[in-house]
From Swiss-Prot:
Domain description: The C-terminal conserved inhibitory domain (CCID) negatively regulates the transcriptional activity of the protein.
Gene (UniProt): Gcm2
Record region (C-terminal conserved inhibitory domain (CCID)): 379-393
DNA-binding region location: 19-174
Name recorded for this polypeptide: Chorion-specific transcription factor GCMb
Organism: Mus musculus (Mouse)
């Protein structure tokens, strides 16, 4: 071949071949004046002297597939040829040449390479080893000494040249570009359905009507709506509450998941109603302005707690919302059925005193003075009317043990219908407490002894100085109903009261 002959001539004419030296000599030629050109395909027993500034020589570059081998001399680099990788069927390429691949340097990579198929005919590949040096691979030696790099080759390659390292790198890069161009459309095609599915999902989410913010449900009191845990219905004119839940779905301890309704209407019982007394600085918060309001349909409220004969509403949160229950228990009134008898009459000399202390005894006796004139009977009528204001009919009422008949109330005169009557609450001194009641004849004071004083409210009411008060007492204007209202209430309840052989 012309290339081989030219290379042989260059080897004969090389400067390194003119000098006598061996790579294993202890002393190498010093300061050579000429250097050889770099040879990529050295073959045969040749010697070259390269300059230490030659880049390819510094890299120990060779067209043959050479790998590093063990060398006991640290100053000499020894490399052996690996051979060439060819097709097992010796197929020809389009240009008529044969496939001659460069063997991999790593042993594992080389074994993996042999298992691959020929890219041209898909036949298996095989490695043709180099045996050009007396049955051993051709060996190349590199040694740096001074300003020269000495190169020596031993053996003649008995196999065809593999593709060079630059050619191999170019082929690999071209193959990578081809594979990238092959997978890129597939990747785009695979990404397009994902993008379309994502857009579909987004479009579905966008098309779905967004949930409106939780509406503030208007809460109004309704006496016909039962609420578990609060059986007492509320009354009109109560405060409007706003919550964000659906109470009709609550059934005891079972809480169903929240469901949104377009226009829910949930009802809460409003604040319980109480009394309303007109006085200086004391005004109840009840929506009912009179004491004779019919309360026969009002059931027991579990939120009411009797303390000191006063009804406290534990669910009330207003500082001025208090409910004072003037019940028949204060004066040992006793319901009767049928004809009144001696056992069913009320003893006014034995009544239950209700002190302001939180600890009291219900059995403590209290006595009234002897029955005074007509003005006092009007006061007794006031007490009877107050009993008609009883809002809670407890099933078990305490009765007084001792009974005593009281003088007849035949001469008792009743207040006219809805006539305001001032009542003076007891003063600080129990002995000087004055209570006046309205009657056709006017106001008549009544002295109450200390052991049977009227119950005082223990609640905190805003008190103001009353210039018209008598002995520091406040005037309470109570709108009382006539006898008709009281009798109508008693007829509906079916429990008339007997007081001194007189049925009411």
């Amino acid at each position: 071949m012309p290339a081989d002959s030219t290379q042989d001539e260059d080897a004969v004419l090389s400067y390194g071949m003119k000098l006598t030296w061996d790579i294993n000599d202890p002393q190498m030629p010093q300061e050579p004046t000429h250097f050889d050109h770099f040879r990529e395909w050295p073959d045969g027993y040749v010697r070259f002297i390269y300059s230490s500034q030659e880049k390819k020589a510094q890299r120990h570059l060779s067209g043959w597939a050479m790998r590093n081998t063990n060398n006991h001399n640290g100053h000499i680099l020894k490399k052996s040829c690996l051979g060439v990788v060819v097709c097992a069927r010796a197929c020809a390429l389009k240009d008529g040449s044969h496939l001659q691949l460069r063997p991999a340097i790593c042993d594992k990579a080389r074994l993996k390479q042999q298992k691959k198929a020929c890219p041209n005919c898909h036949s298996p590949l095989e490695l043709v080893p180099c045996r050009g040096h007396s049955g051993y691979p051709v060996t190349n030696f590199w040694r740096l000494d001074g300003n020269a790099i000495f190169f020596q080759a031993k053996g003649v390659h008995d196999h065809p040249r593999p593709e060079s390292k630059s050619e191999t790198e170019g082929r690999r890069s071209a193959l990578k570009r081809q594979m990238a161009s092959f997978y890129q459309p597939q990747k785009r095609r695979s990404e397009e359905p994902e993008a379309r599915s994502t857009q579909d999902i987004r479009g579905h989410l966008n098309s779905t009507a967004a949930l409106e913010p939780t509406e503030l449900f208007d809460m109004t009191a309704d006496t016909s709506f039962p609420i578990p845990g609060q059986p007492s219905p509320s009354f009109p004119n109560s405060d409007v509450h706003r919550v964000t839940c659906d109470l009709p779905t609550f059934q005891g301890d079972i809480i169903l998941p929240f469901q949104k309704y377009p226009n829910p209407s949930i009802y809460f019982p409003g604040p319980p109603w109480g009394y309303e007394l007109a006085s200086s600085g004391v005004t109840g918060s009840s929506p009912y302005s009179t004491l004779y309001k019919d309360s026969s349909v009002v059931p027991d409220d579990p939120d009411w707690i009797p303390l000191n004969s006063l009804q406290y509403n534990v669910s009330s949160y207003g500082s001025y919302e208090r409910t004072l229950d003037f019940t028949a228990r204060y004066h040992s009134w006793k319901p009767t059925h049928g004809k009144p008898s001696l056992e069913e009459k009320v003893d006014c000399e034995q009544c239950q005193a209700v002190p302001t202390s939180p600890y009291y005894n219900l059995e403590l006796p209290c006595r009234y003075l002897p029955v005074p004139a007509a003005g006092t009977q009007a006061l007794q009528t006031v007490i009877t009317t107050t009993v008609a204001y009883q809002a809670y009919q407890h099933p078990a009422l305490k009765h007084s043990d001792s009974m005593q008949e009281v003088s007849s109330l035949a001469s008792c005169t009743y207040a006219s219908e809805n006539l305001p009557m001032p009542i003076y609450p007891p003063a600080l001194d129990p002995q000087e407490g004055v209570i006046q009641a309205a009657s056709p004849s006017g106001r008549a004071p009544l002295k109450v002894p200390g052991d049977c004083q009227a119950p005082r409210p223990t609640l905190d009411f805003p008190q103001e100085a009353d210039p018209s008060g008598t002995d520091g007492a406040d005037v309470w204007d109570v709108c009382l109903s006539g006898v008709g209202s009281v009798m109508g209430y008693l007829d509906r309840t079916g429990q008339p009261f007997s007081f001194d052989n007189e049925d009411f």
